Amino acid sequence: MQQDGLSSVNQLGGLFVNGRPLPLDTRQQIVQLAIRGMRPCDISRSLKVSNGCVSKILGRYYRTGVLEPKCIGGSKPRLATPAVVARIAQLKDEYPALFAWEIQHQLCTEGLCTQDKAPSVSSINRVLRALQEDQSLHWTQLRSPAVLAPVLPSPHSNCGAPRGPHPGTSHRNRTIFSPGQAEALEKEFQRGQYPDSVARGKLAAATSLPEDTVRVWFSNRRAKWRRQEKLKWEAQLPGASQDLTVPKNSPGIISAQQSPGSVPSAALPVLEPLSPSFCQLCCGTAPGRCSSDTSSQAYLQPYWDCQSLLPVASSSYVEFAWPCLTTHPVHHLIGGPGQVPSTHCSNWP
């Protein structure tokens, strides 16, 4: 059989035309030899056709029963015709759980397509994606005028009516705990401020609350406890609340660049005399153990202890820092001893 085109020789010595399918008589011989029981490798050597070509022809014949080659030359004809596309959309609308290969089988069963002219699975999936995109675009166009249109106030609208949250923003409702839930959470907090995951799970099961809600409650409760402790500490030390925020150029702070004799004594603030109760609070000692050379003139200089992050008070050479007591002589900074009355408070073991 003479064919137009440039012929070539394969590895077995057979002639073929590049880009052209095998002749129909060769295909019939391949099928007849396979029906007689000859193996594909023996058919390939006998007819001098590549083993891959024999396998593809036999596989297509067993699968579809078609022996003729597919269309040659030009592009592949469109198998997804408008009628087929409409039926695919109808099947997917009626049975959303259908797979593409099930739709393909249904098209062949109904007779809309033959077995060799049915659209492939990838083509059906492509059609379904296009239909879904068109549908989503349609709904977007329907919603867009209502969203983009400006909201004009009505002359009969009530201006004093409360406004709800914006439709586009998410609003989280505040969790309201029952008395039993609040009591159980508070008992667990008194037992430990940082419960582990097991304790949180048990508490969530006991209070019928989500574990995330329990975790957030403990976080908020710890923050509330810190605020309460800070207020309690400031109430015990009335002068400490003013010393928490120290300005940059505070008259009570002596910078490192200043010489010892250049700081005037008026720059130091004058506070209240040292009371026995304050000495007992800071030192942890009895009032009788706090000795003073000048009992009527005991003055303190407030400053900030960076290690304990608590404002403490110092006398002439004493620093009231908790839990340890360290001494820093202040008379060296103000030009020598004797200018500030010495007040000594020792830490008893």
Swiss-Prot record:
Residues 278-349 are annotated as: Transcription repression. GO terms for biological process: animal organ morphogenesis; circadian rhythm; negative regulation of apoptotic process; negative regulation of transcription by RNA polymerase II; positive regulation of epithelial cell differentiation; regulation of cell differentiation; regulation of DNA-templated transcription; response to cAMP. Residues 83-131 are annotated as: RED subdomain. Its main location: nucleus. InterPro entries: HD, Homeobox_CS, Homeodomain-like_sf, PAIRED_DNA-bd_dom, Paired_dom, PAX_fam, WH-like_DNA-bd_sf. The keyword Repressor applies. GO terms for cellular component: nucleus; transcription regulator complex. SMART domains: HOX, PAX. Expressed in early pancreas. Later restricted to beta cells. Undetectable in adult islets. It is found in: Nucleus. GO terms for molecular function: DNA binding; DNA-binding transcription factor activity; DNA-binding transcription repressor activity, RNA polymerase II-specific; RNA polymerase II cis-regulatory region sequence-specific DNA binding. It comes from the Eukaryota. Keywords: Developmental protein, Differentiation, DNA-binding, Homeobox, Nucleus, Paired box, Repressor, Transcription, Transcription regulation. Residues 5-131, 170-229 bind DNA. Residues 8-64 are annotated as: PAI subdomain. Pfam families: Homeodomain, PAX. Plays an important role in the differentiation and development of pancreatic islet beta cells. Transcriptional repressor that competes with PAX6 in binding to a common element in the glucagon, insulin and somatostatin promoters. Belongs to the paired homeobox family. This is Paired box protein Pax-4.
